[in-house]
Amino acid sequence: MFSYYFQGLALGAAMILPLGPQNAFVMNQGIRRQYHIMIALLCAISDLVLICAGIFGGSALLMQSPWLLALVTWGGVAFLLWYGFGAFKTAMSSNIELASAEVLKQGRWKIIATMLAVTWLNPHVYLDTFVVLGSLGGQLDVEPKRWFALGTISASFLWFFGLAILAAWLAPRLRTAKSQRIINLVVGCVMWFIALQLARDGIAHAQALFS
């Protein structure tokens, strides 16, 4: 059964490693050393829920509901554009240290709300967990399916906690004005690039839906 665990671990790692909204947010919280362990835990728990839903049957709901998929897609586009705009605004600030200090004043609940939006409004999360993991894990018998799910969940926990701790450890180097400007520019570009990709997919999906 361990072979199924390592298959899930490898696939989960491959899907979670690329820079996206969730990873960018965890990294930034680690650099700020602001509730970064709590955010890593909440991200991992969110992934746990999504992975279990996808592997144990939730994928059918998304695939059979084109309007739900469209709603998730365009909600994600709007959020990613807004998130990217915030990153660009911080990067272009004449006093980036002051802008970063203002971010540090955010309360715990606002940070949690942003984390939930970054996770649950990102359509790629549903495609990864419901479509990819759901199609692969759904073909397995009950016991192998559990080990496969455990492997993918382990990848999420290891990655988010590792990323948060590493970012906090490197914070003295990454918190400089130059580093913050570069990080925010990269995050803004990635968020807008993903948003444009999603918008293109959303338009194609809408054309197929109404044709």
Curated annotation (Swiss-Prot):
Quick one: signal sequence residues? none
Q: Which NCBIfam families match?
A: 2a75 (TIGR00948), PRK09304.1 (NF006801)
As for membrane topology, the entry says:
Multi-pass membrane protein
- Briefly describe its induction: Transcriptionally regulated by ArgP. Lysine has a negative effect on the expression of argO.
Q: Which UniProt keywords apply?
A: Amino-acid transport, Cell inner membrane, Cell membrane, Membrane, Transmembrane, Transmembrane helix, Transport
Its name, as the record gives it, is: Arginine exporter protein ArgO
A single GO molecular function, which one? Answer: L-arginine transmembrane transporter activity
* Family annotation (InterPro entries): Arg_export_ArgO_enterobac, LeuE-type, Lys/arg_exporter
Listed transmembrane segments: 1-21, 37-57, 68-88, 111-131, 147-167, 182-202
Q: Name one Pfam family in it.
A: LysE
Q: To which protein family does this belong?
A: Belongs to the LysE/ArgO transporter (TC 2.A.75) family.
User: Main role?
Assistant: Involved in the export of arginine. Important to control the intracellular level of arginine and the correct balance between arginine and lysine.
Q: Which GO terms describe its cellular component?
A: plasma membrane
Q: What is catalysed by this protein?
A: L-arginine(in) = L-arginine(out)
The main location is membrane
Q: Which residues form a coiled coil?
A: none
Statement: the UniProt record of this protein carries the keyword Nucleus? no
Q: Which gene encodes it?
A: argO
Cellular compartments annotated: Cell inner membrane
